[in-house]
Curated annotation (Swiss-Prot):
UniProt protein name: Tryptophan synthase beta chain
Assigned keywords, A-Z: Amino-acid biosynthesis, Aromatic amino acid biosynthesis, Lyase, Pyridoxal phosphate, Tryptophan biosynthesis
Annotated organism of origin: Shewanella oneidensis (strain ATCC 700550 / JCM 31522 / CIP 106686 / LMG 19005 / NCIMB 14063 / MR-1)
One Gene Ontology molecular-function label: tryptophan synthase activity
N6-(pyridoxal phosphate)lysine PTM positions: K88
Length: 396
């Protein structure tokens, strides 16, 4: 580990817990990333793609009718307006450019809700890279529009039937594939988790979210918000929002994990507040485990939050008290999903609806003028069938 250029740990969390065969690939990736950070032509191409292909900067929208409290302004950072429909596009373009820089011809990715898969497929189509996406068979079934989109853009979608047939199993299969193909392929990890240097790379390619938010809120309000709020699965949209505010100690950072059917039911995906530290997916991080240390299945109505661990920087921010992590249940997220649609004409992703649900809860408790910014990490087109079935009583 001595030859590493960046610190692989955030406090006690993170690291590079991978088979020896993958260490050279991760070191090569780290070197390429460090060089790209100071390469003006790389940064110019990345910025150009974000602006002229993905559509940045995204809007910061003040909600007109949503806030339950006249003293509270709720702003939405509109990552749902990004090409591809979610924040995922930011860092995927960055990593795909990095892969090309390293001379890789193929991209391997995993996806849960399908948003990262779609973002990877569009970046590969744009940049002329071959694309393979691993997706849990359950997620393939519940996210058929995104599966079609990926295939339409030329990606090969591989359903994973092992384990719980969800995101963690797709992660394992993608990592296994990469172990045998890293000389020609880049593993384009979809969240700010996994082995070093992925948590750092993903944060840096997502930090544009918080940078824009800071600039926009200062223009609109002349001050920083009281809190920024984002949903947390692996944690990439949240770390992208938080990164530029970490040193602004007057701004509260609030991550919202999925409480599923309720924290006390074990049917949830809240390892940060209710898990134990373990080794998973190449990193040391909080993990949902049973009493024997076996990984417990996570659960959330939203496929993108259905993950039994969390990125190491979030674990560290929680440990040092810089960020606070709450949770919202399926029912609260569904309520917020419908409320935003009815009040503002915006349909959020179910993932983002968790952050919104907590913001609404917080707004009701505020007793002074307060500005809240919610990262609306994605749009809800992919979730309309799931929500429709639930509201029509077709699912339990």
């Amino acid at each position: 580990m001595s030859q590493l250029k960046l610190n692989p740990y955030f406090g006690e969390y993170g690291g590079m817990y991978v088979p020896q065969i993958l260490v050279p690939a991760l070191k090569q990736l780290e070197s390429a990333f460090v060089e790209a950070q100071t390469d003006e032509s790389f940064q110019a191409e990345f910025t150009d793609l974000l602006k002229n292909y993905a559509g940045r900067p995204t809007a910061l929208t003040l909600t007109r009718n949503l806030s339950p409290n006249p003293m509270v302004k709720i702003y939405l950072k509109r990552e749902d307006l990004l090409h591809g429909g979610a924040h995922k596009t930011n860092q995927v373009l960055g990593q795909a450019l990095l892969a090309k820089r390293m001379g890789k011809k193929e991209i391997i990715a995993e996806t849960g809700a399908g948003q990262h898969g779609v973002a990877t497929a569009l970046a590969c189509a744009l940049l002329g890279l071959k694309c393979k996406v691993y997706m849990g068979a359950k997620d393939v079934a519940r996210q058929s529009p995104n599966v079609f989109r990926m295939r339409l853009m030329g990606a090969e979608v591989i359903p994973v039937t092992s384990g719980s047939a969800t995101l963690k199993d797709a992660c394992n299969e993608a990592m296994r594939d990469w172990s045998g193909s890293y000389e020609k392929a880049h593993y384009l990890l979809g969240t700010a988790a996994g082995p070093h240097p992925f948590p750092t790379i993903v944060r840096e390619f997502q930090r544009i979210i918080g940078e824009e938010t800071k600039k926009q809120i200062l223009e609109r309000e002349g001050r920083l918000p009281d809190a920024v709020i984002a949903c947390v699965g692996g944690g990439s949209n949240a770390i992208g929002m938080f990164a530029d505010f970490i040193d602004e100690t007057n701004v509260e950072l609030i991550g919202v994990e999925p409480a599923g059917k309720g924290i006390d039911t074990h049917m949830h995906g809240a390892p940060l507040k209710h898990g134990k530290t373990g080794i998973f997916f190449g990193m040391k991080a909080p993990l949902m485990q049973d009493s024997e240390g076996q990984i417990e299945e996570s659960y959330s109505i939203s496929a993108g939050l259905d993950f039994p661990s969390v990125g190491p920087q979030h674990a560290h921010l929680n440990a040092i008290g810089r960020a606070r992590y709450e949770s919202a249940t399926d029912d609260e997220a569904l309520e917020a999903f419908q409320l935003l649609a009815r009040c503002e004409g915006i349909i959020p992703a179910l993932e983002s609806a968790h952050a919104l649900a907590y913001a609404l809860r917080l707004a009701k408790e505020c007793t002074k003028e307060t500005i809240l910014v919610v990262n609306l990490s994605g749009r809800g087109d992919k979730d309309i069938f799931t929500v429709s079935d639930i509201l029509n009583g077709k699912e339990e």
